[in-house]
Amino acid sequence: MDNHESYQTLEEAFAATFIKELIPGILHNFANPLNGIMGRTKLLQRRIEENFKKLKEIYPDAAAEMMEEMQRIKKDIRSVSQESESFHDIFKDVAAKFYALAAKGEDNVNISQLINSEMRFFDFNLDLKHDIKKNIRLDNDAPDFRGSTAELSMAFWALIRFAMLRALGSKMKEFSITTEHDNKYVSVFIKNSGDALPAASIDVLMERIDSGSREMTNSVIDRGVLNALLILNKYNARINMFSEESFSTISIGIPYRNERPKRK
């Protein structure tokens, strides 16, 4: 084994332990100072207002001379507060993804909330954030169902990434994702622009899902899509994929009434 192979082996070992061993500590170490910055900034805003009010009462002439400078100071503090809140939102998006990956047990899952978190996480990929026209329509009344957040997060990450990359490689660069529900299913529809997927590839994919096989060769549909749909198949999901000249759609309907996931 040469140095390159040794490095690759260590790199893979590092990646394999990164989420479980390092991410919780990294998030914790970021959260504490960030919360401190936000709290101190709010406190500073209040103190500035209170002290300047006292200054105007005791030394009105001096306060009048300092008014312009005080307005600049308050504006700067507001900017710091707004930027720290923006950073906090970004931090929450990152944390939500890694907490989802750690939630391997069975729990109540809301599909719209999960998809919203996944889409916010994809904003960290700047090509996918800026170069694709996205249409996101989420059913805020979608009911929960029982499942593993970790499994579902990984499955929908793979499906969304596949669709977004195909959209990115197309002329129209369009992507849409929709959630909805009826009296039995919560459903997700993922649609992207791009060349039509070969019917033969779709047929092979559906056969693999039915058989539980993870073999997927000589196909424009990557193995990540197959693995994602195999996971969803354990939830008794209705899975369909169809493709036309310029768009492809993956639809998944997961039962939520008196249904428990099948574990294979």
Regions found by a protein language model. Give the residues of each.
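Conserved catalytic submotifs in the C-terminal HATPase_c
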Residues: 131-143
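Short beta-strand/loop element within the Bergerat-fold HATPase_c
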Residues: 172-184, 191
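Conserved micro-motifs of the catalytic ATP-binding
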Residues: 100-104, 144-147, 237
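Glycine-rich ATP-binding loops of the HATPase_c
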Residues: 177, 235-243
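Conserved signal-transmission helix
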Residues: 1-18, 55, 60-64, 200, ...
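Conserved glycine-/histidine-rich ATP-lid loop and adjacent helix of the Bergerat-fold HATPase_c
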Residues: 227-236
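Glycine-rich/acidic phosphate-handling loop/turn and adjacent ATP-lid/helix
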Residues: 188-222
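Conserved DHp (HisKA) dimerization/phosphotransfer helix of two-component histidine kinases, i.e.
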Residues: 49-125, 131
